[in-house]
Amino acid sequence: MLWKLTDNIKYEDCEDRHDGTSNGTARLPQLGTVGQSPYTSAPPLSHTPNADFQPPYFPPPYQPIYPQSQDPYSHVNDPYSLNPLHAQPQPQHPGWPGQRQSQESGLLHTHRGLPHQLSGLDPRRDYRRHEDLLHGPHALGSGLGDLPIHSLPHAIEDVPHVEDPGINIPDQTVIKKGPVSLSKSNSNAVSAIPINKDNLFGGVVNPNEVFCSVPGRLSLLSSTSKYKVTVAEVQRRLSPPECLNASLLGGVLRRAKSKNGGRSLREKLDKIGLNLPAGRRKAANVTLLTSLVEGEAVHLARDFGYVCETEFPAKAVAEFLNRQHSDPNEQVARKNMLLATKQICKEFTDLLAQDRSPLGNSRPNPILEPGIQSCLTHFNLISHGFGSPAVCAAVTALQNYLTEALKAMDKMYLSNNPNSHTDNSAKSSDKEEKHRK
């Protein structure tokens, strides 16, 4: 009978599982009245305190019984924190930490115990990650313990200027990334940290380093030459007076046009410490000299000087113009004018010879006054090194003309005054005899 009763209970149990409950409650608790039933009572539908129980992740309304010892988001690096250098040990909070937004707002106002001056260092997205810069917390060395915390706000005030120009270039020009100059009061405090400043602040590569090689535009196909473009030259092209944009600079460097050509060029410039803003407007008018790099412009000026020196018909021009002024009464006055003009040209060429504008890899020390040197540098930057040598070559051709004109004037004067010629020849013969003795 007991066996049949057990089978009936099992059958009713199956019906209860399929049909549900009649009064809204399950029949499972009724099985506890059967003393010899192999089934045990069902566990309650509420959590009981248990040391081994791990609560699942639920929204904040769920309250666990045992206290939470750590912030569940402590493993996530907070981009708005000042990282391990300023981190304070987190207190133990009993129970769920509550709304994280309120906790973060409290941390942002207190800055984890730091002085109130650090609250002005926004936006924090401009700062580089301290872990990446130091390559781990051990790179700080033993000098971190001696670093006073109260001096850190003054030292960190220089961080927003990391992206500012590190050299004397106007604001609208290329931004050159360089080491930040710290004041004397803060240098002692920061010097205790053995940090590579080039890695921390974005070091600038050597200005004499070759950025790329550009084929010449004026050379023939049979003798194509390439010119090396240095980092200093790229910086000069991005700076006043030209202020080239990405499109013009890509044309100067003979880069192929592509969809992301400007972006790739800006990324390449950023690696060498130069920043080319997007949507920049050029400052100077575009000429044919704009397409030339400095090496080719200097080469062109040298060839132009050679042609002026060797091929300019200075003697023919001087004889032609002197025939138009063959009057003996004008020859003396004309000769004086030619001598004065030659002296003025000599002064002009001597001034241009003292020009010390930066060109290529050279940055010579200036000789002239800053006022006149800055004007010559402006002209040299516009012409990329072609201007001053070309002007000197042209003035040299003018001086050759003046020299030939003076020789022609002397011949005309001697032809018109034969007696003076004999007197001069006699005097010259007497001088030669005295010199022989």
From Swiss-Prot:
Positions where Phosphoserine occurs in the chain: 239
GO biological process, one term: lens morphogenesis in camera-type eye
Induction statement: All isoforms are induced during retinoic acid-mediated differentiation and by cAMP stimulation of primary astrocytes. Isoform 3 is most strongly induced in the former case, isoform 1 in the latter case.
Domain of life: Eukaryota
Region ranges (Disordered): 14-107, 414-437
Chain positions of motif PPxY motif: 57-62
Biased composition (Low complexity): 65-74, 88-101
One Pfam family linked to the record: TF_AP-2
Cross-link (Glycyl lysine isopeptide (Lys-Gly) (interchain with G-Cter in SUMO)): 10
Record PTM text: Sumoylated on Lys-10; which inhibits transcriptional activity.
Description of its domains: The PPxY motif mediates interaction with WWOX.
Function: Sequence-specific DNA-binding protein that interacts with inducible viral and cellular enhancer elements to regulate transcription of selected genes. AP-2 factors bind to the consensus sequence 5'-GCCNNNGGC-3' and activate genes involved in a large spectrum of important biological functions including proper eye, face, body wall, limb and neural tube development. They also suppress a number of genes including MCAM/MUC18, C/EBP alpha and MYC. AP-2-alpha is the only AP-2 protein required for early morphogenesis of the lens vesicle.
Protein name as it appears in the record: Transcription factor AP-2-alpha
Name of encoding gene: Tfap2a
